[in-house]
């Protein structure tokens, strides 16, 4: 009994190829592998590109397909670039308010980016040479005139305090030697240290005769008001004031008088001066 074609189509598929063929017939827009089609077979492209048995074929048809795919990919990349440039131009039009200026600015930015990229590739050797020349010039200037600051040292911010000057920065050379035995910031007078720990020499041994330059800190003269604290160091005595209230030959008192003793001494001097005025 002959089987009609209508009954064949009604029969369920018996193999995977029939199932794939039926699905391909139902959905005609499913992309197919072009290499497999060139070689007489039909296979869906989804998930098939890696496992295609003709993916490395170098025949004329497959080579033409590969070239066509390359051209299409380049066209897609070009369209994406053009659309991105159009979006940038629209954004610049919103900012600048004119289409011509936006396009010109896009061209200028593109040219500047290309020139900057080329300079970055060509400039490392020149930058290194310039840096070495500048370092050599700075070292020569510091050797010739240690007391005169170089160009990099003279740039000091106006908002910074005087103690952050170029002489106290760690970048300066070691040939710059401070004039005073104990380093003091420029612009400030030497203030007294009322803390006995800082006002005494090491271990309180009589070392003034051995190393007088270590204890050459000028002491404060007698003062009665806070305004005399700002007096310049020229009015201070050169020798430190030594307390003799507890004399000792082994451990002499080498610390200067503290603030309270100075005030008491100053008050006694004022009373004596008033008494002398009354008598005269």
From Swiss-Prot:
An annotated Gene Ontology molecular function: RNA polymerase II cis-regulatory region sequence-specific DNA binding
DNA-binding region ranges: 33-80
GO terms for biological process, alphabetical: male anatomical structure morphogenesis; negative regulation of synapse pruning; regulation of transcription by RNA polymerase II; sex differentiation
Keywords recorded for this protein, A-Z: DNA-binding, Metal-binding, Nucleus, Transcription, Transcription regulation, Zinc
Major localization listed first in the record, in broad terms: nucleus
Tissue-wise expression: Dimorphically expressed in the dimorphically connected interneuron AVG; expression is observed in the AVG in males, but not in hermaphrodites.
InterPro entries: DM_DNA-bd, DM_DNA-bd_sf, DMRT
Chain residue ranges for the region called Disordered: 116-182
A GO CC annotation given for this chain: nucleus
Compartmental location: Nucleus
A Pfam family that the UniProt record links to this protein: DM
Keyword hit for Nucleus: yes
Stretches with biased composition (Low complexity): 157-173
Domain of life: Eukaryota
Bias (Polar residues): 141-156
Gene3D superfamilies: DM DNA-binding domain
Effect of substituting residue 54 to R: In gk408945; alterations in AVG interneuron synaptic wiring. Suppresses the ectopic synapses formed between PHB and AVG neurons when AVG is masculinized by cell-specific expression of fem-3 in hermaphrodites
Function per UniProt: Transcription factor. Required for sex-specific synaptic pruning, probably acting downstream of sex-determining transformer protein tra-1.
Membership in a protein family: Belongs to the DMRT family.
Listed name of the protein: Doublesex- and mab-3-related transcription factor dmd-5
Lineage: Eukaryota, Metazoa, Ecdysozoa, Nematoda, Chromadorea
Recorded name of the encoding gene: dmd-5
């Amino acid at each position: 009994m002959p089987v009609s074609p209508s009954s064949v189509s009604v029969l369920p598929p018996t193999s995977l190829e029939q199932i794939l063929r039926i699905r391909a017939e139902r959905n005609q827009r499913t992309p197919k592998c072009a290499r497999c089609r060139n070689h007489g077979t039909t296979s869906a492209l989804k998930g098939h590109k890696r496992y295609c048995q003709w993916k490395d074929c170098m025949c004329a048809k497959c080579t033409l397909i590969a070239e066509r795919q390359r051209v299409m990919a380049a066209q897609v990349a070009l369209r994406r670039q053009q659309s991105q440039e159009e979006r940038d131009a629209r954004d610049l039009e919103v900012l600048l308010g004119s289409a011509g200026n936006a396009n010109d600015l896009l061209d200028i930015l593109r040219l500047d980016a290309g020139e900057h990229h080329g300079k970055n590739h060509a400039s490392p050797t020149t930058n290194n040479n310039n840096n070495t020349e500048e370092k050599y010039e700075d070292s020569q200037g510091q050797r010739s005139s240690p007391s005169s600051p170089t160009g990099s040292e003279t740039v000091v911010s106006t908002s910074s305090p005087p103690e952050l000057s170029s002489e106290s920065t760690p970048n300066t050379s070691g040939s710059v030697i401070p004039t005073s035995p104990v380093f003091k910031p420029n612009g400030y007078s030497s203030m007294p240290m009322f803390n006995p720990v800082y006002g005494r020499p090491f271990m309180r041994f009589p070392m003034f005769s051995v190393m007088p330059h270590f204890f050459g800190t000028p002491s404060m003269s007698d003062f009665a008001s806070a305004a005399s604290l700002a007096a310049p160091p020229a009015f201070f005595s050169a020798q430190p004031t030594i307390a003799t209230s507890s004399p000792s030959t082994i451990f002499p008192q080498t610390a200067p008088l503290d603030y309270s003793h100075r005030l008491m001494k100053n008050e006694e001097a004022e009373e004596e001066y008033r008494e002398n005025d009354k008598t005269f």
